[in-house]
């Protein structure tokens, strides 16, 4: 019988950070994850963009969020002897007059994050992009190496016997008054971090969830500067793995798989 404070289902970004913070507070955890080849976390671009939407609004509480995010990624990286976060400006190319005017408005308002680009930067972009409206620069912005983060944290959990590599069976879960029982595991609490898989579990199957799907293209773009990220409307381009680029994402409400 294994006894822990918290049973965590799923080791994506959410499950990884919840287990990290709980362990830092001295709690004992067991993470159950069957390591699917594809998941929302594993295919995420890792871009942190401080502005959003057609009107290029500054994200609510972004200064506090950026401080927390950068500090946390650096702390986890230090613990695991890895670097998970890098600062990379975003060149945003307005695809429409509406987006162009929205960006110009933010610059005139002296928005903290949106700036004009230099002639040299404009010439650099023209080597790979065709554009009618002048691009702007979003800074600071950040890129997270999500794949490295997940694999490194998985190794850490395995090292300290905090990971069970298996599929979670909801039917084997028993909720007692003072504990959680799952197979040969007793826990004080259970936290579900396995995304879409929870939708079919009894407690939540009747809730009005909206399931969405995004697809991204992984492409080789020789000559494109990996020191930056790029954006045009809803399309983002970010450095990926092995000299490739992540291009996406679609946003689908109806799909078969």
Region annotations inferred by a language model:
Residues 139-233:
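Predominantly flavin-linked oxidoreductase catalytic cores and closely associated redox partners
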Residues 47-127, 131-132:
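Dinucleotide-binding Rossmann-like beta1-alpha1 core, especially the glycine-rich loop
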Residues 2-12:
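Beta1/beta-strand and adjacent pyrophosphate-binding region of the FAD-binding site
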Residues 25-27, 159-160:
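Conserved dinucleotide-binding and phosphotransfer motif residues
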């Amino acid at each position: 019988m294994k006894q822990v404070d918290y049973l965590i289902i799923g080791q994506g970004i959410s499950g990884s950070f919840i287990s990290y913070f709980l362990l830092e507070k001295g709690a004992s955890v067991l993470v159950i994850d069957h390591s699917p080849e594809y998941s929302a976390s594993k295919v995420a671009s890792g871009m942190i963009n401080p502005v959003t939407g057609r009107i290029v609004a500054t994200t609510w509480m972004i200064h506090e969020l950026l401080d927390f995010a950068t500090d946390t990624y650096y702390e986890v990286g230090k613990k695991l002897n890895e670097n998970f976060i890098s600062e990379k400006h975003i060149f945003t190319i307005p695809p429409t007059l509406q987006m162009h005017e929205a960006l110009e408005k933010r610059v005139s308002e002296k928005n903290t994050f949106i700036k004009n680009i230099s002639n040299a930067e404009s010439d650099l972009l023209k080597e790979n992009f065709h554009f009618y409206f002048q691009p702007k620069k979003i800074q600071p912005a950040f890129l997270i190496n999500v794949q490295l983060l997940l694999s490194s944290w998985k190794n850490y959990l395995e090292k300290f016997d905090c990971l069970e590599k298996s599929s979670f069976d909801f039917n084997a879960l028993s909720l007692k008054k003072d504990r959680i029982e799952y197979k040969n595991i007793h826990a004080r609490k259970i936290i579900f971090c396995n995304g879409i898989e929870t939708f079919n579990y009894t407690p939540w199957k009747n809730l009005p969830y909206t399931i969405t799907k995004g697809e991204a293209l992984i492409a080789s773009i020789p000559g494109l500067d990996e020191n930056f990220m790029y954006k045009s409307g809803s399309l983002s381009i970010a450095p990926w793995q092995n000299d490739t680029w992540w291009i996406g994402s679609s946003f689908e409400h109806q799909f078969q798989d």
